[in-house]
Curated annotation (Swiss-Prot):
The gene is trkA. Residues 143-227, 368-453 form the RCK C-terminal domain. Its main location: membrane. This is Trk system potassium uptake protein TrkA. GO terms for molecular function: potassium ion transmembrane transporter activity. It holds the Pfam family TrkA_C. It comes from Salmonella typhimurium (strain LT2 / SGSC1412 / ATCC 700720). Signal peptide: none annotated. It is a peripheral membrane protein.
């Protein structure tokens, strides 16, 4: 596939890195020559320096015969104009744009279609982050929760702790503990190394366990791996930007929410707009303020300012002063590995959420959902099976007959409204949504090929 990526920042660069090794012809456009040179030194791709919305630049990038344009520059307006130019002048078939401003996203249905601004797929990073954090609040103790098949199935990542009945026991004993609940452990990472789970695999404390189950059973399965944490009640947010304000709006109906904002004018605006959130003007690194607001009674402290260092330091202080759990928003990928699992319980990467959303639109075959896991090393995907036994490598076959790439596990199959946790004898049918986990994303091309029906396949 011939893909033009506009923007060589963290998201554009990471997307190029993901796609360049999958037999795609990638061209990256940016105004920053240094960034482009750095990418070209690392990967086999073309670069063009210039403004991504200019027709001359797009023509030089190969827009005349490009299959897809992905606009992820730092400017919403540039991304929108680029999609318009690609549509009007070059008839580019697929156009994807990252749009950050809530003012645009709020009216997305009216703004972004072929008769207005021709964007086929809109990526709204702030909304993705809010959704991600909200899922983690719904499942206290989970490191990551990803929904598939319109929320019917979830993949959860949980650290195994002493106190969970499964610790020190084989995976096969889970069926004895929960005879009426189906789940499949897709992978276990032990000391950062993947283990292919089998019934005889002993779960150890400290294991990072990836499992798939019907969404209503996630909490029950988590209770096998750790003592279930009580649902959160009191939440403190730091940062009143788009993410903080959106999160407060989403949470304030069901939780006791306090929000700290260091800009006085913004704090006053939020105090008027938010219905049940208590808004404070102040600095989250102010010990007196945290003490006055009873930080020791807070169930979850979430720092979502645009300053990584401020988020990390305020969360560390909150934890030291008694907050039960702390979560931080981290822009720099290198910081995520450094902080998560130390004093910081969970680090959220907006870039990773954006990449996952982008990949679901640029994958081949009928891939309707992608989630990048373990800092981009692993992937969970939702693919739709098409064809019949003569044209498909999966339709009409039981799972045991399907030649899956190394490190790939089918976790669940959704057929209509029915969720079926995978077993070797489950037969895949036309239209099934198949949820898979890959411990190594380098095999994603093989998975895509597996789900691409071919008139020549017999």
């Amino acid at each position: 596939m011939k893909i033009i990526i506009l923007g060589a920042g963290q998201v554009g660069g990471t997307l190029a890195e993901n796609l360049v090794g999958e037999n795609n012809d990638i061209t990256v456009v940016d105004t920053n020559g240094e960034r482009l040179r750095s990418l070209q030194d690392k990967f086999d791709l073309r670069v063009v320096q210039g403004h991504g919305s200019h027709p001359r630049v797009l023509r030089e990038a190969g827009a005349d015969d490009a299959d897809m344009l992905v606009a992820v520059t730092s400017s919403d307006e540039t991304n929108m104009v680029a999609c318009q130019v690609a549509y009007s002048l070059f008839n580019t078939p697929n156009r994807i744009a990252r749009i950050r401003s809530p003012d645009y996203v709020r009216d997305a249905d009216k703004l972004f279609h072929s008769e207005a601004v021709p964007i086929d797929h809109l990526i709204a990073p702030e909304q993705l982050v809010i959704d991600n954090i909200y899922r983690l609040i719904e499942y206290p103790g989970a490191l990551q929760v990803v929904n598939f098949a319109e929320g019917k199935v979830s993949l959860a990542v949980v650290k195994a702790y002493y106190g969970g009945p499964l610790i020190g026991n084989a995976l096969s004993t889970m069926r004895e503990h929960m005879p009426h609940i189906d789940t499949r452990v897709a992978a276990i990472f032990r000391h950062d190394r993947p283990i292919r789970p089998q019934g005889s695999t002993i779960v150890e404390a400290g294991d990072e366990v990836f499992f798939i189950a019907a969404s209503q059973h996630i909490r029950a399965v988590m209770s096998e791996l750790q003592r279930l944490e009580k649902p959160y009640k009191r939440i403190m947010l730091v940062g009143g930007g788009n993410i903080g304000a959106g999160l407060a709006r989403r949470l304030e109906k069901d939780y006791s929410v306090k929000l700290i904002e260091r800009d006085q004018q913004r704090a006053a605006e939020l105090a008027e707009k938010l219905q049940n959130t208590i808004v404070f003007f102040g600095d989250a690194s102010d010990q007196e303020l945290l003490a006055e607001e009873h930080i020791d009674q807070v169930d979850l402290f979430i720092a979502v300012t645009n300053d990584d260092e401020a988020n990390i330091m305020s969360a560390m202080l909150a934890k030291r002063m008694g907050a039960k759990k702390v979560m931080v928003l981290i822009q720099r990928r290198a910081y995520v590995d450094l902080v998560q699992g130390s004093v910081i319980d969970i680090a959220i990467s907006p870039q990773q959420a954006t990449i996952s959303a982008l990949l679901s639109h640029v994958r081949k075959a009928d891939i309707v959902g992608v989630s990048s896991l373990r800092r981009g090393v692993a992937e969970a995907i939702e693919a739709v099976a098409h064809g019949d036994e003569s044209t498909s490598r999966v339709v009409g076959r039981v799972i045991d007959e399907i030649k899956l790439p190394p490190g790939t596990i089918i976790g669940a199959v959704v057929r209509g409204n029915d969720v079926m946790i995978a077993n070797d004898n489950l037969r895949i049918e036309q239209g099934d949504h198949v949820i898979m986990f890959l411990t190594d994303k380098k095999f994603i091309t093989d998975v895509e090929r597996l789900f691409q029906p071919s008139p020549f396949f017999l």
